[in-house]
Amino acid sequence: MHSRQQEIAVALHVCAPFTGPESVQTEIERRIRFIQSCLRESGMKTLVLGISGGVDSTTAGLLAQRAVEGMRAAGEGDHYRFIAVRLPYQVQHDEHEAQLAVDTIKPDECHTVNIGTAVLGLAAATEALEPLSPEQRDFVLGNTKARMRMVAQYTIANARQGLVIGTDHAAEAVMGFFTKFGDGACDLTPLAGLVKDQVRQIAAALGAPEQLVHKVPTADLEELSPGKPDEAAHGVSYRNIDDFLQGKPVPDEAAQIIVDTYDKTAHKRQLPKEP
């Protein structure tokens, strides 16, 4: 066991391993209640979430839809609604899976905002991009795509008295695998503390198709590396990340990659610094 496993797990509020179907269901209910309490406390009426077709957004969407349906069924008001948002950049290569996710969630509403024009317009107007290599430019615009998607979600939320849901969980948080003020910007994170396999278990328990539950995770932000798996970007598998966070034995090399990346990305998990 690496000397920092417990420290990092505590900092990220890692959820205890599930012990069976009952514990999965208990966690589902707890997180639905959390979403409902966020709506009540904020005074907002809707939940807004971008649906990519991956297991994380599918799971968060299923929890959100159940949360608002529960509030309506309890007589708290028909105004509580979940708005799913499709956010393709021009043509989405996994369009079928994104649509499958929407069909699975059955959101109250589904909007589509193609961010291509906005991203390319900003790129054309930004002189700082001109001296960059193709690889550097691709990386920068990848982060711009993530930020533009969050702009779109907050625009809808602002118009509809809504809260924006984030899909961050412990296995991504430890690696800083999100864009600062992009997909890392949100009002609530109902998957927080879960490791990747727990997200999959919850998705399966909520009825997500096997195709989405076990889809290879990819941020798919860089055009020069389309469909690049998260694990290729991490340099370590989600199995190793999950085991590390749950205090299980992990190969020394994998553990060191996780710790080094956690330290390097600390700024992403902190509020802006003050004097």
UniProtKB/Swiss-Prot annotation:
Residues that bind Mg(2+): D56, E172
Function noted in UniProt: Catalyzes the ATP-dependent amidation of deamido-NAD to form NAD. Uses ammonia as a nitrogen source.
Protein name: NH(3)-dependent NAD(+) synthetase
UniProt-listed GO biological process terms: NAD biosynthetic process
Alphabetical UniProt keywords: ATP-binding, Ligase, Magnesium, Metal-binding, NAD, Nucleotide-binding
Top enzyme category: ligase
Any one Gene Ontology molecular-function term assigned to this protein's record: ATP binding
Upper taxonomic lineage: Bacteria, Pseudomonadati, Pseudomonadota, Gammaproteobacteria, Pseudomonadales
Gene3D superfamilies in the record: HUPs
Pfam entry (one): NAD_synthase
Entry-linked CDD domains: NAD_synthase
